[in-house]
């Protein structure tokens, strides 16, 4: 299986490809180093993500998992960067239990690209994270995405900038 190790701000990560799709993103260095066009594209997109230039990924993915887990992972990909959802919110939307959502999150073979870090406990508690340095990594990823998130028009309505709250001069 072609693999490509990457040095990132979170340490060494390894991308794996099988049959023309990304199948894993693992913490640490893989056993193989075979650069394919898809692995290079994925590595470039991850670099852009870490540089704050990208908030999502456009890659063929084929994570190994049950049909239920695949449904959860698809739901994770629909959570916008810079936002979070609770395990309970996802459970209600998928008609299942929060614990099942947590199990699917923990089994996610392509973290970051399938953004399981965007799921938090009820009440806003950060919850767990199985990758990297655990919760510290999850906090880092969420902070990165909040900084990279494009401003929404409503973000500007309540915060006038000094000097910009007066009318424009007339010609």
Located regions from the model:
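Active-site and channel-lining beta-strand-loop segments
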Residues: 13-15, 117-121
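Mobile beta-alpha loop/short-helix "lid" or hinge segments that flank ligand
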Residues: 22, 112-113, 119
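Residue-level recognition of specific faces of alpha-helices
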Residues: 75-78, 112, 125, 140
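Basic nucleic-acid-binding alpha-helical/helix-turn surface characteristic of O6-alkylguanine DNA
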Residues: 1-96, 144-171
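Major-groove DNA-recognition helix of helix-turn-helix-type DNA-binding domains
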Residues: 104-105, 109-114
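Intrinsically disordered, low-complexity basic tails/linkers immediately adjacent to helix-turn-helix/homeobox/MYB/SANT
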Residues: 119-141, 148
């Amino acid at each position: 299986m072609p693999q490509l190790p990457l040095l990132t701000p979170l340490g060494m990560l390894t991308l794996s490809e099988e049959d023309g799709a990304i199948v894993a993103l693992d913490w640490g260095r893989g056993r193989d180093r075979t650069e394919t066009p898809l692995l290079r594209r994925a590595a470039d997109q991850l670099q852009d993500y870490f540089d704050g230039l990208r908030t999502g990924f456009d890659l063929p993915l084929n994570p190994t998992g049950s049909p239920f887990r695949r449904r959860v992972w698809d739901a994770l990909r629909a959570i916008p960067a810079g936002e979070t959802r609770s395990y309970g919110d996802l459970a209600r939307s998928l008609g299942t239990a929060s614990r099942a959502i947590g199990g699917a999150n923990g089994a996610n073979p392509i973290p970051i690209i399938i953004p399981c870090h965007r799921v938090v406990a009820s009440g806003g508690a950060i919850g767990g994270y199985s990758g990297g340095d655990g919760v510290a990594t999850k906090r880092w990823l969420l902070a990165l995405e909040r900084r990279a998130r494009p401003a929404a028009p409503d973000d500007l309505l309540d915060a006038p900038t000094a000097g910009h709250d007066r009318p424009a001069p007339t010609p």
